[in-house]
Amino acid sequence: MQRQRGFTLLEIMVVIVILGVLASLVVPNLMGNKEKADRQKVVSDLVALEGALDMYKLDNSRYPTTEQGLQALVSAPSAEPHARNYPEGGYIRRLPQDPWGSDYQLLSPGQHGQVDIFSLGPDGVPESNDDIGNWTIGKK
């Protein structure tokens, strides 16, 4: 009589338990990395937007107003005060969105500096604890 090949039910159950234990250890670490990566993207975007705003100020002796917003970096603002020395291609090609699909916000003059650039964070609610702004860069 030939012996049948294959795995017993007990062997399969042991493998499933081991995979479950490994998954319970790995998944929480992956979730934390996603949050860190999202925050790092926001920081990178804020640094790039700050640089573009500084170039705007060098050319026009002022930052765009809150009403003109960050869109003033892509196309010349139509509202007063008009940009005097606006480059043909703008200061950036397009405005990035934060990792949660929202637009970055500009407050000029800012509450924390000359200009505040910020993301509303994961909850999308202004002035909540998860907002990330150019004034928080370097802080935990």
Curated annotation (Swiss-Prot):
UniProt topology in membrane: Single-pass membrane protein
Location(s) in or outside the cell: Cell inner membrane
Claim: Protein transport is one of the keywords in the record: yes
TM region(s), chain numbering: 7-27
Predominant location category: membrane
Superkingdom field: Bacteria
GO cellular component: a single term: plasma membrane
Pfam families: N_methyl, T2SSG
Location of region: Disordered: 120-140
Propeptide part(s) removed at maturation, as residue ranges: 1-6
Keyword Flavoprotein: no
PTM annotation, UniProt: Cleaved by the prepilin peptidase. Methylated by prepilin peptidase at the amino group of the N-terminal phenylalanine once the leader sequence is cleaved.
N-methylphenylalanine carried by residues: 7
Gene Ontology BP annotations: protein secretion by the type II secretion system
Keyword terms: Cell inner membrane, Cell membrane, Membrane, Methylation, Protein transport, Transmembrane, Transmembrane helix, Transport
Cited function: Core component of the type II secretion system required for the energy-dependent secretion of extracellular factors such as proteases and toxins from the periplasm. Pseudopilin (pilin-like) protein that polymerizes to form the pseudopilus. Further polymerization triggers pseudopilus growth.
Subunit composition and interactions: Type II secretion system is composed of four main components: the outer membrane complex, the inner membrane complex, the cytoplasmic secretion ATPase and the periplasm-spanning pseudopilus. Forms homomultimers.
Family listed: Belongs to the GSP G family.
Protein name according to UniProt: Type II secretion system core protein G
Natural source organism: Klebsiella pneumoniae
Gene: pulG
